[in-house]
Amino acid sequence: MSKNYHIAVLPGDGIGPEVMTQALKVLDAVRNRFAMRITTSHYDVGGAAIDNHGQPLPPATVEGCEQADAVLFGSVGGPKWEHLPPDQQPERGALLPLRKHFKLFSNLRPAKLYQGLEAFCPLRADIAANGFDILCVRELTGGIYFGQPKGREGSGQYEKAFDTEVYHRFEIERIARIAFESARKRRHKVTSIDKANVLQSSILWREIVNEIATEYPDVELAHMYIDNATMQLIKDPSQFDVLLCSNLFGDILSDECAMITGSMGMLPSASLNEQGFGLYEPAGGSAPDIAGKNIANPIAQILSLALLLRYSLDADDAACAIERAINRALEEGIRTGDLARGAAAVSTDEMGDIIARYVAEGV
């Protein structure tokens, strides 16, 4: 693999810098094992950028991201900056503008129950025993969150509020292709979530998804209403491979998927644009209460690196190597404190060292 790649690294706040350090250890192992030419540059973002530059997303950070093939993002936010106006706080002032600037229209959230962690799953033991490995593909830029008109008007008993669910054909086509392409790298099944028995936007959604499905004859397509999907995720999550969702439905289902895994410290996330450029981050927050204690679980950050390799650098072999290394560590009972349940726990640094070593060894 001879191409040169460049990654913008944005560690951020709280546990972000310490878990990012572990992801970069793993990246070193990937570089060496797969002879990949990958360089990195670090930039301030979030609260760290406010402290150092007076704003959560400095121009130099945006420029650095523009020059990169992908962004590896840590986490932002914390009580130190909560007194600031909302649009100047780390989350709203950094992450949302980055998504908008790079036109990141799709969000990918894997949710997997790892062998040995079934006890953390809040579902019944017989359901958890079947395991699950789901990818929730959510459209990020359309739908009811952004549709117009929206607002409030009137007064007294006639006061009202309104939002508008709007989807264009091109928005549905491109998110559907992301889901089908992802399914080709997984178990070849897409379940599209809608409310086509009631909503016009969902009727269009279903029609277009059916059209796109003809381009992917090797991928099985099923449709499911959102209300049934929320129940089926509790009843038997193992039936799902890729979930294809609108903005609102994906917002709901991706969090439900996260909850049934039992540990936010294990969940990565990817946001992509049409050119394959992506921002990759853990699904959890900055956890300022445990920052600097060397006890945070770095696996979500390391898995975010795996997604980056798979989707932005087209290095699926390297991504799989990371995932296998994590599987082995967990199967051997290696746990950070959030997963230890009274047993011996390893530190953040130790978990990073172990996973990097397993990647290097090619387990």
Swiss-Prot record:
One of its GO terms (molecular function) is NAD binding. Catalyzes the oxidation of 3-carboxy-2-hydroxy-4-methylpentanoate (3-isopropylmalate) to 3-carboxy-4-methyl-2-oxopentanoate. The product decarboxylates to 4-methyl-2 oxopentanoate. GO terms for biological process: cellular response to amino acid starvation; L-leucine biosynthetic process. The lineage of its organism: Bacteria, Pseudomonadati, Pseudomonadota, Gammaproteobacteria, Enterobacterales. Optimum pH is 7.6. GO terms for cellular component: cytosol. Mg(2+) binds at D227, D251, D255. This is 3-isopropylmalate dehydrogenase. Optimum temperature is 70 degrees Celsius. The record marks Y145, K195 as: Important for catalysis. Belongs to the isocitrate and isopropylmalate dehydrogenases family. LeuB type 1 subfamily. Keywords: Amino-acid biosynthesis, Branched-chain amino acid biosynthesis, Cytoplasm, Leucine biosynthesis, Magnesium, Manganese, Metal-binding, NAD, Oxidoreductase. It comes from the Bacteria. Substrate binds at R99, R109, R138, D227. It comes from Escherichia coli (strain K12). It is found in: Cytoplasm. Pathway: Amino-acid biosynthesis; L-leucine biosynthesis; L-leucine from 3-methyl-2-oxobutanoate: step 3/4. It catalyses: (2R,3S)-3-isopropylmalate + NAD(+) = 4-methyl-2-oxopentanoate + CO2 + NADH. Binds 1 Mg(2+) or Mn(2+) ion per subunit. Its main location: cytoplasm.
